[in-house]
Amino acid sequence: MSNEMKIRFWGVRGSYPTPGAGTVKYGGNTPSVEVQAGNRTIILDAGTGIIPLGRELARTKRAGELLLLFSHLHHDHTQGFPFFVPAYMPNAKLHIYGPDGTHESLKNVLEHNQSSETFPISLRDMSSSKEIQAVRESQVIVWDEAGVRVAESAVGLSDEAVVIRIHKSYAHPGGVFVYRITWHGQSIVYATDTEGYVGTDKRLVKFAKDADVLIHDSQYLDEHYWGQLEGFPATQGYGHSTVTMACEVAASSLAGQLVLFHHDPAYTDNMLAGMERTAKSLFADSVAAHEGLEITLSPRFDYANAPLSAKEREVQYAQNG
């Protein structure tokens, strides 16, 4: 089994899908990101990007066991799930975790999205095995030799465990989960649908400290956010960040790489290319996410050859992961 962790972006657009000539380079599908940790597949959100991802998982016979994490339950992060091919495969096992909604449980929201009034096939009629569970900020999600489960701490886990920590951000209407995925010393932070604060979001900076890759909401150009871009109303308070806000978090948290994410649906490829240039001037290792973008991370530590006890490795992992 490879010790590399791979990220692939299948949907990078916010709010609603935007097909067309103006979005060919970066793509128009709404959020969905695949993380491959060895032979384990973790999916972040189920916007329309999960539709081509599902077809690829089925084609490559990688749909046996999957972990799907919802950041929150707004439509652009759930709308692709009814069309997710592995959910219809009897031999597929889906672990679906995320926050409860403001007024409904996670499971009820997913069921409502596929009620008879809105979709011809119910959640129950999808043939896969599904474990649907709401999680809390204080918990961790673990995927190790024993399988996928929710735990109260990450103490005592093996080196092979994928550990996913949760940070709840209140900088988006209804709140949103930010996830930190760690495996073999490599860390990815997924911070979509969050809005920056004056002086940066210090809680998020602490949570994202030393992440190898920070995927951060950057829906707006600064002039759009402040109502200074012709044809675009001000968006302060909408729960999304500017390029500058994303770069401030990346710099303050000492992230290795910043990936701009959740692009505004009205932005053309040319606008996003300009946004990427702006980001690079503020945080050099920045890239604007596009469909098909792949990032590969190599293990930060060689546990097999390290002259440390299991307890010492656990401490080192906690300090550096």
Segments from the language model and where they lie:
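Binuclear metal-dependent hydrolase catalytic cores
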Residues: 1-189, 195, 199, 269-320
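Cap/insert and terminal regions of metallo-dependent hydrolase folds
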Residues: 184-187, 195-291
